[in-house]
Amino acid sequence: MKKGFMLFTLLAAFSGFAQADDAAIQQTLAKMGIKSSDIQPAPVAGMKTVLTNSGVLYITDDGKHIIQGPMYDVSGTAPVNVTNKMLLKQLNALEKEMIVYKAPQEKHVITVFTDITCGYCHKLHEQMADYNALGITVRYLAFPRQGLDSDAEKEMKAIWCAKDKNKAFDDVMAGKSVAPASCDVDIADHYALGVQLGVSGTPAVVLSNGTLVPGYQPPKEMKEFLDEHQKMTSGK
């Protein structure tokens, strides 16, 4: 009982120290008008990572200097986006909400931020059978380019809330309509994560290690790129 009390006291004290350490950072964020944020350790000493709905920031412990954008680890044979690697936890947390087209003989998994009003997103989806045949599993998340209150967002909400999400997505991409629907899926979560990962247009492809590949690539070129990328980053 005594040991349990001591452990609780130590944890409470540590939590208090952490909040005190972040006080300068929180003050700076408040001054910048950033209300919703998650402060985490950074891969560089003397800094913290701040996750916001507008992207990822790196801020010094004293709150005086801020860097916006991805951070790269260049110690290996190829640069690694450590910012997006950190965000993989949030990405995987949305796995149950993804619309997945699984390859029969899976070799690679890509997550695609898509928009039903995007021409190249349609082109990518039309070639889904080819991606799958090459061993590429495609997982979709929604990224309405016109914003969260747009018609596209509402239609994508209906797709993601449909009983058969894959059929609903196929139908809409083929020019058909989908019945309005509501559920617990929040497209804003998809969109916010996309922004944090650096998505600014669609389609945007996120690899299994967090690397962001903007734009459309045909199936064969995508397969070649994924194979080469896997070789370069193996062991990272």
Swiss-Prot record:
Homodimer. InterPro entries: DiS-bond_Isoase_DsbC/G, DiS-bond_isomerase_DsbC/G_N, DiS-bond_isomerase_DsbC/G_N_sf, Thiol:disulfide_interchange, Thioredoxin-like_fold, Thioredoxin-like_sf, Thioredoxin_CS, Thioredoxin_domain. This is Thiol:disulfide interchange protein DsbC. Changing residue 121 to V: Loss of activity. One of its GO terms (cellular component) is periplasmic space. Belongs to the thioredoxin family. DsbC subfamily. Keywords: Disulfide bond, Periplasm, Redox-active center, Signal. It is found in: Periplasm. Residues 36-231 form the Thioredoxin domain. Acts as a disulfide isomerase, interacting with incorrectly folded proteins to correct non-native disulfide bonds. DsbG and DsbC are part of a periplasmic reducing system that controls the level of cysteine sulfenylation, and provides reducing equivalents to rescue oxidatively damaged secreted proteins. Acts by transferring its disulfide bond to other proteins and is reduced in the process. DsbC is reoxidized by DsbD. Changing residue 183 to L: Destabilization of protein. Disulfide bonds join 118-121, 161-183. The gene is dsbC. Pfam families: DsbC_N, Thioredoxin_2. One of its GO terms (molecular function) is protein disulfide isomerase activity. Gene3D superfamilies: Disulphide bond isomerase, DsbC/G, N-terminal, Glutaredoxin. It comes from Escherichia coli (strain K12). It comes from the Bacteria. Changing residue 118 to T/A: Loss of activity.
